């Protein structure tokens, strides 16, 4: 039952609400400035600057939340404001959002500040935004008509598809020359023709393109959609910058599954300038209807909004399901206790209180490793994690075996309380949540020969891409990797992760005598950061099918020279290009230097 006041009589309530909104507005202004800065760094080819910008931006939100919390404590003694005033604060905040362009994100910021000040017994819709209050539908950027959320183009007109695409590219006003834009436009037109074949143009044939570029790694992406009749198709064009400073269109992505991979939870967040983020999410959801809005917000760099939406979706699922949380199937970890809800496609990971040998780590060190992954370029090979504190679950939904495991291995992380409805709850004090995947060891054990080969190709590629991004996984057992819905192999166990540049890549020394040669134990000295690629075959090549596929596709994996070459390149300051699509899709591999052909549209107009 709601206890909202009938009258808004408190000046303090309004001032507190205004202070919180000012804090959010400052955050979002800085957030947008990062995206504008990303364009200049891309044009200059300053990849280290882009990486640093990405890392810095992740910290902005928490910095502004702390800043706002301190102001409220210092100026309004927020911890001692009574309940009636807090209810008025929320209502004033709602009123201030009436014409706001990012109301959903502002509500989340409000929650973040309040949960730093209020006890968790206040975490209900009377005091925070457990549910959204302001609709984000049809918010328009009326103050800046020159830059709408997206622009519409009509390739069925006289200029044709080629001219239309060229205008799309020029409208982004990139301050760097193209190597050969007519050639690249020709490639795009050719690829469109090959993909759609005999494509008849309907009267409503048009292309919508989001007004801002999407920056990530060393690429800038044009994101749009093609509308023809009652069909909508994705359109994504990555722009790359060569060593000579010239730009090129690298490929065109036209399949829904390609867009899903581009916006996957295994990639770093995009930097994109959005006046109205909800409009971008709506646009992208039209192209990826099965992708949760939470994941789209997160991929756009609004990870706190994504986290908030995920939790709302999770609570909704709990209300409409009855299965129990259970210990996750598979090999139990030494560091994490992992559980899952079978009807929900995620796993929950709790750091244990004690770590048996040979693990030598601490809770804080493990958390720092997960933060490292959050801030690093995940290059499509490391799963993103959602981190929560003090999460209350219905105790009746926990399997008895799971409760015993939690009390045995992580007692400091478990509390019990009475819920608002009088039911018993179990509170997990700290938990990571990740997408559930098929463990690679199970995939390899149960798969067909073709699946085993695919899994090993992907595993080798994943490791090579990770070390190219300066990530050494540490524990490379197959159980620490998962296979996504799209068949990509992804790393998800981060407690032993290191920078490759901090590792000493070594050859196994030659034995000095027969005793050393026959020894079943390591007889040579091993430093804390030493790695020996020649020894990896011992625990990776036991299965004959795996061994055959591994040596056929990744024989260099066990050669220290391959690892050392990556380390040397990183130490020299070189940045690797990572592609969120198969290399065979790149125009340089698909068409080479072949003539692009006529850039006129190959599409035929449908009969009226």
From Swiss-Prot:
Q: Classify the source by domain of life.
A: Bacteria
- Decide whether keyword Hydrolase is in the record: yes
The record lists the lineage as: Bacteria, Pseudomonadati, Pseudomonadota, Betaproteobacteria, Burkholderiales
State the name under which the record lists this protein: Isocitrate dehydrogenase kinase/phosphatase
Organism the protein comes from: Ralstonia nicotianae (strain ATCC BAA-1114 / GMI1000) (Ralstonia solanacearum)
- Signal peptide annotation: none
User: Which UniProt keyword terms apply here?
Assistant: ATP-binding, Cytoplasm, Glyoxylate bypass, Hydrolase, Kinase, Nucleotide-binding, Protein phosphatase, Serine/threonine-protein kinase, Transferase, Tricarboxylic acid cycle
Q: Which residues bind ATP?
A: 328-334, 349
As for subcellular location, the record says: Cytoplasm
Which reaction equation describes what this protein catalyses?
L-seryl-[isocitrate dehydrogenase] + ATP = O-phospho-L-seryl-[isocitrate dehydrogenase] + ADP + H(+)
* E.C. numbers: 2.7.11.5, 3.1.3.-
What does the protein in this record do?
Answer: Bifunctional enzyme which can phosphorylate or dephosphorylate isocitrate dehydrogenase (IDH) on a specific serine residue. This is a regulatory mechanism which enables bacteria to bypass the Krebs cycle via the glyoxylate shunt in response to the source of carbon. When bacteria are grown on glucose, IDH is fully active and unphosphorylated, but when grown on acetate or ethanol, the activity of IDH declines drastically concomitant with its phosphorylation.
Q: Does the keyword Kinase apply?
A: yes
GO MF terms listed in the record are: [isocitrate dehydrogenase (NADP+)] kinase activity; AMP binding; ATP binding; phosphoprotein phosphatase activity; protein serine/threonine kinase activity
Annotated S-S bridges: none
Catalytic residues (UniProt): 384
The record's similarity note reads: Belongs to the AceK family.
Q: Name one GO biological process term.
A: glyoxylate cycle
Q: Name one GO cellular component term.
A: cytoplasm
Q: Which HAMAP family match?
A: AceK
